[in-house]
Every structure is written in structure tokens, then in C-alpha cells.
Amino acid sequence: MSNNQTLFERAQRTIPGGVNSPVRAFRSVGGTPRFVARAQGAYFWDADGKRYIDYIGSWGPMIVGHVHPDVLAAVQRVLADGFSFGAPTEAEIEIAEEICKLVPSIEQVRMVSSGTEATMSALRLARGFTGRSRIVKFEGCYHGHADSLLVKAGSGLLTFGNPTSAGVPADVAKHTTVLEYNNVAALEEAFAAFGGEIAAVIVEPVAGNMNLVRGTPEFLNALRALTAKHGAVLIFDEVMCGFRVALGGAQQHYGITPDLTCLGKVIGGGMPAAAFGGRGDIMSHLAPLGDVYQAGTLSGNPVAVAAGLATLRLIQAPGFHDALADKTRRLADGLAAEARAAGVPFSADAIGGMFGLYFTEQVPASFADVTKSDIERFNRFFHLMLDAGVYFAPSAYEAGFVSSAHDDATLDATLDAARRAFAALRA
């Protein structure tokens, strides 16, 4: 029995399902999860000592690679001064200033500890600001595990094949309307029917939890116009795509200004940190200024802030995002070319440092399109690549991530492994 198997059996005795987040359990693809012993750059090593090229990067945060020396040094500098205070620090101001500088739509920002906290708090704030209750979200977009958002949610729920969650009261779910992603007609119909009831529309402008699906400019511009017309708050959930699609996030890429933005992953540099922010007139409704309550013991944790600040400064290097996008596009195009050469139905897409792999002929534009993927073939491909030392997301419903640490050698090795994997799929 391998060390990974031994650890998984041991974990299941004290941790539900053996993991602390469902997608890690390999339920979708089968087999034994890899337990990580250490990581460096573009690689990690499992409990059996095997090295893998890592295309998950902690599900997005590791944009500069694992254990970047600048991030490590920043964390080491603050550790000796204390881990957590429950009181303000100068570093909290510094990271807030950095976020507001990089994302101009954010006039004020509040730090939290997870993406779920960011979206949950942004929705409460939107409801408090508008005095309305209804929320609109989109099928396949995942915004964390708050009750009002677990309505046909994507991401982890898809991994174990359950489109809703037990424990969410019907009285909570009824305030959430779910529409088709990239469907402008459905959006217009919803606003015509109950636009005056909508507190907020929350959307991933680049979705990453039903695999990678881009919002179309037409769809996102319609969102901006309709929310403005009806007095609803437009929330961009950029927890995943923020600072990855572009330095200023997807909103910079598309040239669209939301009212509120949720951030996470990259702003913690691998530590637990997230944030939500936006228009000052909306943010002023937060306690202690306003009557919308939000708080957190570990919000603005000094260790997480140090890692986040170091990461945000690194990604501002000239040409950083152009180089990252070039690497990611080379990977996606290379995988598609290898599949085409092998005669395997497959498509791929990339934007910034995110990519999607689909066992379909066409790149999907909606959740319904994603569900047409050949899941059995994806699972075989996943394990062939895993055996070759390449770690893609263990689910056909998750995007992948490239970091600045992925160099030509890692990309070449990945494409060589893919050539063999696609040949095996054809056989």
C-alpha cells in the first residue's frame, strides 16, 4: 500500500470523506488523492516522494509559484512580531491601498479570510444598501458555500454529483434566482419581470468552477446596463480570476466597472485571505459606519497580509501578465494540437493565467455546454497524466492555473506526456 493510500485511510477515520474540501477526494475521477509533502516553484512532491507538475496551484493563489523567495521572506519577517492581534495594523492599510490602486472600481475594501466570506458579506451589503432581498446568480458559477448561493451551485458540488445541498432552507433559497450564463435574453426577461426586487446580481466574469467559461462582452455589458437601470448592485466575483486574467482583473480585461468586487486567492499569496470592496457610498453602509454588520477575528491577519502584499508587488513587474498569458495559451493550444493529431475530440481555452480542458469539439459558453463533455474520457486522461507526473484538476468541472514558475521545460514535459496520453485514449 502506498503512503498516499495509508494517509487517505487514516484521514477518513477523523475527517469526513478524508478531506477538508470535497474536490480533493478524487470522487469524480476515482483513485487515491495525492497527499502533498512539499512544493517548490511549479512542482509538488507527494507522500510517496513522486514529483508532479502542478496545474492547480492551491486552486489559483500560487500565481508566482510555490514558496517564492520574496513571499517566504515577507512571511518570515512578520512571524517574529506575532501571528494575530485582533487589532488594526499598518500592513492592513498597505494592502488596502494596493488593492484600491490595482482595481480602480474599488474605492474602499474590507479584508476577510475566505472567498465565501467575501461573497456572503457583499450580498448582505447589497441587500442592506438597496433594501431588497432577491439575488440573481448564474448556473455553473460558484460563489462559495453560503446558503443563499447553494442553489444549483457548481464546483465542489458537481464533483460528487449533487446539484443542491441538504441543510439549505427553502425559505432562504427562494430569494435566489438562477439564470443561464451568457444568456442575454434570459437576463432581460428576468429584469423585466422583477427588476425592482433585485438587490444584486453576482457573477464570475470569467467562470472557473464549471471549468473555464468566459463571460461574453455582450452578456457582461448587458449586466452592467440592466443593473444600473434598475438600481441593483452588480457584484463581480473575482475570487478566482482577479489578478489572473489581468493585473486589474477581468473588469480591466473587459472594460466594465462593477459596483462591488470580491477578491481572494492571489491576495493571500497562499494564506487564508480574501476581500470585498467597491463604491464608497455602498461600502459606507458597513459597520462600524453603517448598519450592515460584518466582522472577523482573523480578518487582516498579519501573516496572510504579508504574503498577499509580497505577491501583489511581484505581479506588478513589467510584462508579468503578458508572459503568464503566453505560457497559458501555449499550454492550451499545445494540448489541443496533440489531441487533434491523435484524433481525440477535445478543445481548450486560456485567458490570462487560467485555462480549460474540454472533451468536446467546441469550447463551452454555458454550464449546459460543459455537461456535454466526455467525462469518462476526461477521467482516463487525468489518470494518464497523473501517472506521468502532471497534476491537473481532479474534476472535469474545474479550471486549471499556470504560474510564473512554469517554464519551457515544464510546458514541454506536459505536452510530451499529453501526446502519449492522447495516443492511449485513441487506442
Curated annotation (Swiss-Prot):
Signal peptide residues are none
* Domain of life of the organism encoding this protein: Bacteria
* Key words, A-Z: Cytoplasm, Isomerase, Porphyrin biosynthesis, Pyridoxal phosphate
Needed co-factor(s)? pyridoxal 5'-phosphate
Q: Which GO terms describe its cellular component?
A: cytoplasm
Q: Which Gene3D superfamilies does the record associate with it? A: Aspartate Aminotransferase, domain 1, Type I PLP-dependent aspartate aminotransferase-like (Major domain)
What name has this protein been given in UniProt?
Glutamate-1-semialdehyde 2,1-aminomutase
The encoding gene is hemL
